[in-house]
Amino acid sequence: MAFVSMKELLQEAKEHHYAIGQFNINGLQWTKAILEAAEEERSPVIAAASDRLIDYLGGFKTVSAMVAALIEEMSISVPVVLHLDHGKSPERCKQAIDAGFSSVMIDGSHSPIDENIAMTKEVVSYAGVRNVSVEAEVGTVGGMEDGLIGGVQYADIGECERIVKETGIDALAAALGSVHGKYQGEPNLGFKEMEEISRVTDIPLVLHGASGIPADQIARTIRLGHAKININTECMVAWTEKTRSIFKDNPDLYEPRAYMTPGISAVKETVKHKMREFGSSGKAVCTQKIEI
């Protein structure tokens, strides 16, 4: 099965008030767990590779070929989006598209809005004729993830409206209080601003840094237009805690499969739980495929 664009998937999710999870991949076994979870839940899924991990994972072509091969070997029948997370430049986004990625995020959020819009327009122009979806970001999500470090800077409503109207993006990540990594204290999301941004942009919104946000707040973000929710830290914590417990009980263990398998199973269960929480379980639909 080829990868699919997330454009139609997110439009469907927004219309029917559920969200599709983006789960970041950290290697072959990790990817396998995400795909297994999606197939068992009959949920569409967004498998994402952070631009800051692309080289660690072997490069754009390696990531694309690995995920495509797993889809074929595992007979995955649900829609799978292969997404570049936090693309650092238009050039990097183009490399991902050329390698077979079906969706990209251009992260110009640390630049002035005019530069952000210019970069985003360049990516949309390249992606659009190739049926590849594009996500952009306004404002700054705080915390640290895959080397991305920063403080929270709320998205400006006017800038959100501008970038949507001037670029033709398919999804918008508007920073409204979420953070990458673990939360220090309770999350403090800007629901009032969220509602207004959803109203003026009228496109699917993306929630970054969703790990650790309580289920009732997640449900509220979905009601307010979020159709894509990004999860990474919760999966990493599940894997790490399980792996640590294995070594604590078996300090002399050295066979990788023996200690990796329980951790990967923990990742899979975390993904399945999130799919149910987001309401995407049972929502697998057919959409446009991107051949690689």
Swiss-Prot record:
Xref: InterPro entries? Aldolase_TIM, Class_II_FBP_aldolase, FBA_II, Fruc_bis_ald_class-2
- Name the positions where dihydroxyacetone phosphate binds: G181, G209, A210, S211, N230, I231, N232, T233
Q: What is its EC number?
A: 4.1.2.29
Can you name this protein? 6-phospho-5-dehydro-2-deoxy-D-gluconate aldolase
Keyword field contains Endoplasmic reticulum:
no
Recorded superkingdom: Bacteria
Which residues carry out catalysis? D85
Q: What's the stated role of this polypeptide? A: Produces dihydroxyacetone phosphate (DHAP or glycerone phosphate) and malonic semialdehyde (MSA or 3-oxopropanoate) from 6-phospho-5-dehydro-2-deoxy-D-gluconate (DKGP).
Q: Which molecular-function annotations from GO does this UniProt entry contain?
A: 5-dehydro-2-deoxyphosphogluconate aldolase activity; fructose-bisphosphate aldolase activity; zinc ion binding
List Phosphothreonine occurrences by residue.
Answer: T233
Which UniProt keywords are given for this protein, alphabetically ordered? Answer: Lyase, Metal-binding, Phosphoprotein, Zinc
Query: Which cofactors go with this protein?
Result: Zn(2+)
CDD domains cross-referenced by the UniProt entry:
TBP_aldolase_IIB
> What GO biological process term is on the record, naming one?
fructose 1,6-bisphosphate metabolic process
Q: Which reaction does it catalyse?
A: 6-phospho-5-dehydro-2-deoxy-D-gluconate = 3-oxopropanoate + dihydroxyacetone phosphate
Q: Which gene encodes it?
A: iolJ
Which Pfam family, any one of them, does this sequence belong to? F_bP_aldolase
The residues listed in the UniProt record as binding Zn(2+), with positions renumbered to this chain, are H86, H180, H208
Per the record, the pathway is:
Polyol metabolism; myo-inositol degradation into acetyl-CoA; acetyl-CoA from myo-inositol: step 6/7
Name the source organism: Bacillus licheniformis (strain ATCC 14580 / DSM 13 / JCM 2505 / CCUG 7422 / NBRC 12200 / NCIMB 9375 / NCTC 10341 / NRRL NRS-1264 / Gibson 46)
**Which family does the record claim for this protein?**
Belongs to the class II fructose-bisphosphate aldolase family. IolJ subfamily.
Record's keyword annotation contains Phosphoprotein: yes
